[in-house]
């Protein structure tokens, strides 16, 4: 007689590894991490989705403040008091809000990007299927620096962000390929005015320019040290077949992925499946007024969240 218990999702651990579960056995030529970046309304989401479909990879849309809501429970989006006390509409309406809203927003988004990147790595190591992501925690800093340049946030926020960024992504492996879509700011503004949400149309052109400068002057040079880089104009990015051809010609002969083996992949998989551990560095104990709340308010919000 066979005993049948309740069905449970088994978590990967050392026993699975001892029994022969190896990441490299599942890998194919497309078992890679690709990221697609660009300014607002640059068409990065469309290109990322097309690449994923063409190469049989998994597409990860850009992580927003509700990323955790969408992947847990029944997918219901919870109020902003459970999501960092922030929202995009308020940011565009008042980017210099004196209560520190702009930094709360970007810090919360960064945490969600870190969580999503961990999910992407876990998917790759578990299934062998490659992933294509719309932005990542590696490029997120261009928004924070643009906010600082525009006077939206205080220097202490910039310093805090740099600290949590360094300690939160150092355990990850960077993307194999970073794709950048270069759309001039005037064209970005035109697209936002034509198809953007009403509050997005208030975005400052100088803020958009700072985002572009951050990508070109800092992100691309830095990521090129460990990852392959492809850059396209908006028109070139429309030709997905040409993009796929360019990807196929890449050698992928640099970066830390080349130094990995089944043992290191085993430890990485253990790390990225522990989502609480992944997010611990994002919540280091520092007194930053913009993102700090009182104990009573914390307790009230916490128990409200538990009751949802």
Predicted regions and their residues:
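N-terminal mitochondrial targeting presequence
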Residues: 1-28, 308
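NTP-dependent small-molecule kinase module
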Residues: 2-7, 190-308
């Amino acid at each position: 007689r066979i005993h049948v218990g309740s069905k449970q999702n088994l978590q990967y651990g050392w026993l699975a590894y001892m029994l022969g579960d190896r990441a490299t056995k599942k890998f194919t030529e497309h078992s890679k991490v690709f990221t697609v970046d660009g300014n607002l309304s640059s068409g990065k989401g469309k290109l990322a989705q097309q690449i994923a479909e063409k190469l049989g990879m998994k597409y990860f849309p850009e992580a927003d403040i509700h990323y955790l809501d969408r992947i847990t429970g029944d997918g219901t989006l919870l109020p902003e008091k459970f999501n960092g006390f922030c929202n995009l509409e308020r940011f565009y309406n008042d980017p210099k809000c004196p209560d520190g809203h702009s930094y709360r927003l970007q810090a919360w988004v960064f945490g969600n990007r870190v969580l999503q990147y961990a999910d992407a790595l876990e998917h790759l190591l578990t299934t062998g299927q490659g992933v294509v992501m719309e932005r990542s925690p590696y490029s997120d800093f261009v928004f924070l620096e643009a906010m600082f340049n525009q006077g939206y946030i205080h220097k202490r926020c910039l310093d805090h962000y740099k600290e949590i960024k360094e300690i939160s992504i150092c355990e990850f492996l960077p993307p194999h390929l970073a794709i950048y879509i270069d759309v001039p700011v005037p064209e970005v503004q035109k697209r936002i005015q034509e198809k953007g949400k009403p509050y997005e149309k208030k975005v400052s052109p100088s803020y958009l320019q700072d985002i572009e400068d951050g990508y070109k002057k800092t992100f691309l040079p830095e990521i090129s040290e460990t990852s392959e880089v492809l850059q396209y104009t908006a028109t070139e990015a429309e030709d997905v077949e040409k993009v796929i051809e360019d990807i196929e010609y890449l050698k992928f002969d640099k970066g830390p992925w080349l130094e990995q083996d089944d043992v290191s992949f085993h430890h990485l998989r253990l790390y990225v499946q522990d989502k609480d551990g992944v997010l611990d560095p994002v919540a280091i104990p520092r007194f930053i007024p913009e993102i700090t709340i009182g104990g009573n308010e914390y307790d009230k919000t916490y128990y409200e969240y538990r009751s949802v």
